[in-house]
Regions:
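Short, conserved phosphate/pyrophosphate- and ester-handling motifs at nucleotide-, phospho-/glycolipid
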Residues: 240
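Conserved PLP-enzyme active-site core in the AAT-like
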Residues: 1-218, 222-236, 244-247, 251
Length: 251
């Protein structure tokens, strides 16, 4: 909502924000938002909540459980809303030791979701899965109308077929999660507090100014106010993580 150049609102839709807890919203919040709209005497003056947008994992590295997704799905069904899941980091969510969701679950419980490629080792692109029948029919037309059509080709499909069928998509993401847990443990052992409890490839820690300066001499990390983000990826090596862990121990 803050880095997308108003792309959603540029299509004539309005974003209704809900407060999050560690990057997540709940079925109860969504139900309250929808109910508030339908309880209005004159709802025609207000924005109709029509689609719920979630990220898996969230921007904070946290995960929705299958139970939470099912509850949100049920609310969406009750109020006639679509459920969309942003899967830019899908591989890292599926590979987490705390995850209990599968791609099959997303296919059954959402209307639209996508399997992230660019952040998970693909050359380019994302794989969009549409399960809602009423959205499938005109989707290519929507793409054309909004200038979102790639030149015709077969390479994007080939790379996803190769990565998914071989299992490399899942294995590479899981490796990144395992390495992130090593970084997490190193910070925990050092007594460094975390801004949020994450079991995926993104770790958000709260460093002192001195600790930041020491690590910044060798490493690049995103400084988000009081919080610093350390990420692993499909390309991260064990040697790189071992070096970082050693330097964390020296803080």
């Amino acid at each position: 909502n803050c880095h997308e150049a108003a792309s959603i609102e540029n299509t004539g839709h309005k974003i209704l924000e809900l407060p999050n807890t560690d990057g997540k919203i709940t079925a109860q919040q969504i139900a309250a938002c929808a109910k508030a709209y339908y309880d209005q005497d004159e709802p025609e003056y207000l924005t109709e909540p029509k689609m719920v947008y979630l990220s898996f994992p969230t921007e904070k590295g946290t995960l929705y459980s299958k139970k939470e997704i099912k509850e949100i799905h049920d609310v969406c069904t009750k109020y006639g809303m679509y459920l969309f899941v942003d899967g830019a980091r899908m591989g890292y969510g599926l590979g987490s030791e705390k995850n209990d969701l599968t791609l099959k679950d997303f296919a059954e419980l959402t209307d639209v979701f996508y399997i992230g490629g660019t952040k998970c080792g693909a050359l380019f692109g994302e794989a969009l899965i549409i399960t809602a029948q009423d959205l499938k029919y005109r989707f290519k037309a929507y793409m054309k109308q909004n200038g979102a059509v790639l030149a015709k080709g077969w390479l994007m499909g080939l790379q996803f077929a190769t990565m998914l069928e071989s299992g490399e998509y899942f294995e590479a993401a899981k490796r990144a999660d395992v390495l992130a847990m090593q970084i997490k443990k190193a910070f925990e052992d050092k007594g460094v507090p975390f801004a949020v409890e994450s079991f995926t490839n993104q770790q958000f820690v709260i460093l002192t100014e001195q600790q930041k300066q020491e690590l910044a001499q060798k490493y690049y990390f995103e400084d988000e106010g009081d919080t610093q983000r350390f990420c692993t990826s499909w390309a991260t090596t064990e040697d790189e993580v071992d070096m970082l862990v050693t330097d964390i121990e020296k803080l």
